[in-house]
Amino acid sequence: MVEAGKLGSDFEAMTVPEAELKRTDAGLIPQGEGWFVLNARDASWIRSEDRGQDTDFEGRQEWTDLGFRIQILSPGQRGLYHGERGQEDFLVVSGECVLVIEGEERNLKAWDFVHCPPWTKHTFIGTGDGPCVIVMAGSRAGGFEVVYAVDDAAAKHGASVLEETSSPDEAYSRFGEEKRSAYSEGWLPS
């Protein structure tokens, strides 16, 4: 740990610029590196009929250290069973979902937290009678790497690939197209 005042004049003279937020029909999209403040309701979202919708806080840049998003799953919407190179953590903020993790099912509700060390295979499926909101964070240290795995428990929910792959495009090829969208009222809790 570096003590305060020990970084010297280089740190004191350094400033991190504010990133531009570009307004589009689908919401605000960060442009370039730098800090920014962006309300999730103003952000651009990525939607799929099968996979739900999630925030696009990164824009076209891919953050190198940490991925962060809010995903909303309506009942029956789901991701695909997979494991990633980096640690991932999830917090269910509202609603209900089923977590398939290492071949086992767990029912989750608001304020349940899930910790996945690297390569923990998992996916979420929306359940209940309304949307499920999940805050997701994942390490990108060492680069992004993913494997979509075949799993019987995930297959019961339509959330398993038919053949193992490390290609997101290949894994999700049977799902509907993703499109950018502006926030719709009611997606997030008040």
Feature locations, PLM:
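Conserved short histidine dyad/triad with adjacent acidic residue
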Residues: 48-56, 69-84, 118
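Extended, acidic-biased charged interface segments
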Residues: 134, 138-142, 146, 150-151, ...
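A short, N-terminal "cap"/entry segment at the start of jelly-roll beta-barrel domains
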Residues: 1-65, 156-190
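Short acidic-glycine-tyrosine-enriched beta hairpin
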Residues: 89, 103-119
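Short, conserved beta-strand element in jelly-roll/cupin
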Residues: 65-75, 83-100, 138-139
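Ligand-binding loop in jelly-roll beta-barrel domains
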Residues: 98, 118-144
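A generic "binding-loop/recognition-motif" signal
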Residues: 77, 85-86, 104, 120-121, ...
